[in-house]
Amino acid sequence: MTAAHRNETVTRALTGVVFVAVVMGAVAWSAWSNALLWAVVAVLAWAEWFKAPEGPPTSWPKPLLFLFPVPALAALVWMGEADPYDPWPILSFLWMIWANDTGAYVVGKPFGKRKLWPAVSPGKSWEGTLGGVAAAAGVAWAALGSEWLWLGGVMGALSTAGDLTQSAWKRRRHMKDSGNLLPGHGGIMDRFDGFLFAAPVYAILWCIFAP
């Protein structure tokens, strides 16, 4: 490993630790800090999108992108409005999404042979996707109970769909990352793209099936 690669790995790891600590801390602290967290994420996401290069004529106009993250972030704020405040459902959601990302990488890196959507995200494979879904299901089982195993699988699949949507948007604009706010990780939407479809569906399913 070269010195540059080592430094990049250390930077990525430190950024990841700080990122996870801040997000989990804000969610766990109170309903107000949870709402503030997602409001800040929304503002940063909008800033990244509006600073991005213009896409082809068939791309979505930038003003329309203003609405894109609203359902996901509003769902996480709404879930924090329970009285008394209970951060566990939101934390469980975060762990499922992160487990999906980790499982997809751990399985896809050595075993990924069949590409999921090479034109949009060449690094993603069917094997990695299944590994991510399995990891998310395992976290749902551990955090919420065996009866929620299916929910983890659904969140894993929807997280991947959000990731692919963001990748397609970046590719049409010839962008590698959505920004550079998080050293070693890219922009804010590179970390939260998995929430786009998963968070609203999670909130709806939780409302229907949670005791």
Identify what each model region corresponds to.
Residues 136-137, 194, 198, 207:
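Hydrophobic transmembrane alpha-helices of multi-pass small-molecule transporters
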Residues 105, 166-175:
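Juxtamembrane interface at the ends
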